[in-house]
């Protein structure tokens, strides 16, 4: 499947929206409470700008270079942009002001570095804390038991506001197992909200991608990150 044209993207987003709404209703939730984040890794500014006319709520970027290029080119057409990839501390400055939400904070070291740069810029940066729910070495994120000290550290910051959690469960074909991982993340999300940390607002639960977004919504996701189902297969030879 090659990269889709505008008409194909339009059809894809309409189908995704229908599936999102059905999954939300199945769980007794308001479909309007779940946002669609278009994961636009490797897409050109022209493709991103074209998709901005579709019912996409927010754009998600994995690479700082692509976030900068698309943001500076106006490709998001006024819609919010989030950073959803692994963030290196030496690139934080470029993300601030371009990403309204950094979804992938996975260490106290990164948290402190964002605090430092946000203080210099005189802003309060919204973030999500990333949880490695499957304990996979190939993925970033904190172990579930390490979430609590990270929340303690985040609550003490003056220029960071925690808005929720992000997770990528292990890829598997077992539907029940997938839902168990997603349910575990939701449980952490609820527990974090109940603990009443200052400066922490459990509003956004970012989980679910092209292969499991319906399950994620059934298990409580408020934002799903979808790339290939919208845009088609990625051509990694084009961009970083």
Where are the model-predicted features located?
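Gly/Pro-rich active-site loop or hairpin
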Residues: 141, 239-240
């Amino acid at each position: 499947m090659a990269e889709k044209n505008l008409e194909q993207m339009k059809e894809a987003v309409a189908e995704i929206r229908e599936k999102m709404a059905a999954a939300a209703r199945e769980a007794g939730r308001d479909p309007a409470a779940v946002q669609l984040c278009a994961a636009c890794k490797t897409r050109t500014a022209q493709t991103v700008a074209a998709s901005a006319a579709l019912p996409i709520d927010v754009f998600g970027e994995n690479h700082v270079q692509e976030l900068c290029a698309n943001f500076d080119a106006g490709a998001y057409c006024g819609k919010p942009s989030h950073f959803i990839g692994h963030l290196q501390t030496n690139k934080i400055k470029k993300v601030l002001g371009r990403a309204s939400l950094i979804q992938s904070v996975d260490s106290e070291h990164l948290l402190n570095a964002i605090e430092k740069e946000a203080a210099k810029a005189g802003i309060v940066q919204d973030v999500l804390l990333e949880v490695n729910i499957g304990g996979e070495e190939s993925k970033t994120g904190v172990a579930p038991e390490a979430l609590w000290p990270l929340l303690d550290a985040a609550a003490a910051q003056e220029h960071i506001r925690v808005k929720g959690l992000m997770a990528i469960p292990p890829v598997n074909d077992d539907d029940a197992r997938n839902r168990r991982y997603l349910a575990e993340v939701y449980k952490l999300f609820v527990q974090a909200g109940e603990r009443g940390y200052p400066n922490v607002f459990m509003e956004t639960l970012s989980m679910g991608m092209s292969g499991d977004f319906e399950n994620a919504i059934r298990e409580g996701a408020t934002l799903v990150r979808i790339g290939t189902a919208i845009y088609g297969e990625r051509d990694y030879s084009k961009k970083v």
